[in-house]
Amino acid sequence: MDDGMAAQPAMGQPQVGDVAASSDAFPVAGAGDLPVVAPTSRIATWVRLIRPAALLLVLVPALTALALLWLRGARIMALPALAGLISLTMVQAGASLLDVYLEYARRARLPDAERHDQLTARALLAHSRVQPLTVLPVSIALLMLGALAGIPLLVSGGWPVALLGIAGLAIAFLFSATAFALKRFSLADLLIGLALGPGIVTGMMLAQRHAPTTRDLLLSGALGLLAMLPAEGAHLRDADQDKALGRRTLVTTLGDGVGRAIYVLFLLAGFTLLAFAALPKGAPHGALVGFFALPAFSIPLTGVLRARPGRAREQIVPQELRAYAVFGFWLLLGLAINAILISGLGPIPPTV
């Protein structure tokens, strides 16, 4: 059954969904919509508040970087690889919690009729037994622990990895925090694409003491563009709220029609870069298996093109996160199969 056919709650009755559908986080546009009842366990609430589906936005590019090195025949150093995965997970979780708390605090000023956030993490926080003020210190602690967990990457990769790590941590914090949060500005979504694509792939490869090739960057660009889609879907959904909060997103600045066109452009550009990275001779052809995810992306695309702003678009963000998860599965599976099949033929040379 299509998610959009789910029964609507009675008038005035709050509907609380999965954590991850918050409107526009870098940490990032959240994910799920699994249903409607707030968990009775505080642990379950905390798990939902970190938006588990959004963790894939950092884990897929990190694992892709390691898979590309495996295809080259490079020796994967276990400590930097594991530290990178742990650090990215903790920073993403901390940034998600920070965004949930700040969005909860900011949108509390809006009238109930303007919030339209029944399927979001901030709604879950509002109706859970978790004290909102406890979310803030936990989020800061996770960000700090994530930074500490990344120390092995700095030791292995040196100052270039340190610069990327500092930039990533700063974006994760400043995207939501302070009165001049980056998410308030039109071009901030480009930071999502750079951080969740080339930034992570480059950092993970440098920590393994290998430089990314042009085709590595093309593939990471595809990941970054597809990671921007949940944020674009959230902007299309929350245009009225963003206007009330004074945010200059691409949708509020250029209009709904242009916003939808940008969404389609990002989707097409992502798969175009994937083809450019995987089709040439000597390229990791297994990455082409990622095209099997196209049917999954058609579901949120239909909502973007046909649904009206507001409640009718509530399902776009969780559907987009599901589509990204499907893409990540097929991409990593294709790269793994590629590596296994060529293991007897020699690694793919690290050339353009």
Question: How does the language model describe each region?
Answer:
Residues 2-83, 87, 95, 180-183, ...:
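Topogenic membrane-insertion module of multi-pass membrane proteins
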Residues 63, 73-104, 162-173, 213-233:
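Membrane-embedded alpha-helical segments that form the functional core of polytopic membrane enzymes
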Residues 66-86, 147-163, 200-221, 273-286, ...:
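Helix-coil boundary and interhelical linker segments in multi-pass alpha-helical membrane proteins
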Residues 90-116, 228-251:
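Acidic (Asp/Glu-rich) catalytic motifs at the cytosolic membrane interface
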Residues 279-346, 352:
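Extended hydrophobic alpha-helices typical of membrane-associated regions
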